[in-house]
């Protein structure tokens, strides 16, 4: 007999933030002014959904800057929640940086979400580099998931003292094995 496998997919939605057709940039390739708020909403929404569904993750893998608020919430807002108490956080960095800093009020918006953290001062200027630096503070492991990662960010990752997986070509024969070994090393 054939086993029926079903995957469930959940969407975090908000008409104010996600009703537009473009994801991060407008038609002129400018970043939306509310990208910081959208990232904050997304992070909170994902974690509240995980709690509501009573999932207990072993590893939370965040991909690039837009999900970068998740590690901060896990370590500062949800740290005492039994669902997240033992979770390990992996952050993958890509070449998707932005030239202009996000909204200058981002630091205060994160603080208003219940994040009490002296390291928030890193986001006095919420540039791509500073956001990555802040996110890496709360990661248990870092992956350079692109050969086009910002060189400054890649160097910060290498000097972080955290377990690091350097860029792996998806065509490499040992691609999946290297990722599996990396996950095993942080658990």
How would you name each of these model-derived features?
Residues 3-5:
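Short, small-residue-biased leader/transition segments that mark boundaries at the very start
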Residues 8-59, 116-129:
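Conserved nucleotide-sugar donor-binding subdomain of glycosyltransferases
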Residues 15-19, 66-68, 95-98, 148-150, ...:
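Short, solvent-exposed loop/turn segments at secondary-structure junctions
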Residues 37-110:
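Conserved nucleotide-sugar donor-interacting segment of glycosyltransferase catalytic cores
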Residues 61, 139-146:
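A short beta-strand/loop micro-motif in the catalytic core of glycosyltransferases
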Residues 84, 97, 112-141:
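Membrane-proximal helix-turn-helix segments that form the acceptor-binding/catalytic region
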Residues 92-93, 145, 167:
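Generic beta-sheet signal
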Residues 132, 150-185:
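Helix-loop-beta element that forms the nucleotide-linked donor phosphate-binding surface
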């Amino acid at each position: 007999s054939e086993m029926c496998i079903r995957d469930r997919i959940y969407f975090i939605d908000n008409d104010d933030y996600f009703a537009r057709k473009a994801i991060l940039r407008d038609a002129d390739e400018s970043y939306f002014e509310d990208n910081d708020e959208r990232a904050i909403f997304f992070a909170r929404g994902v974690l509240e959904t995980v709690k509501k569904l009573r999932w207990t993750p072993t590893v939370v893998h965040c991909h690039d800057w837009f999900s970068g608020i998740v590690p901060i919430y896990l370590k500062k807002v949800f740290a005492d929640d039994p669902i997240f108490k033992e979770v390990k956080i992996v952050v993958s960095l890509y070449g998707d940086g932005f030239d202009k800093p996000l909204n200058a009020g981002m630091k205060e918006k994160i603080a208003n979400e219940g994040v009490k953290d002296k390291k928030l001062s890193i986001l006095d200027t919420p540039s791509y580099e500073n956001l990555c630096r802040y996110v890496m503070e709360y990661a248990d492991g870092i992956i350079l998931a692109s050969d086009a990662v910002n060189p400054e960010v890649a160097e910060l990752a290498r000097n972080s003292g955290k377990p690091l997986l350097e860029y792996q070509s998806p065509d490499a024969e040992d691609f999946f094995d290297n990722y599996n070994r990396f996950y095993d090393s942080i658990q």
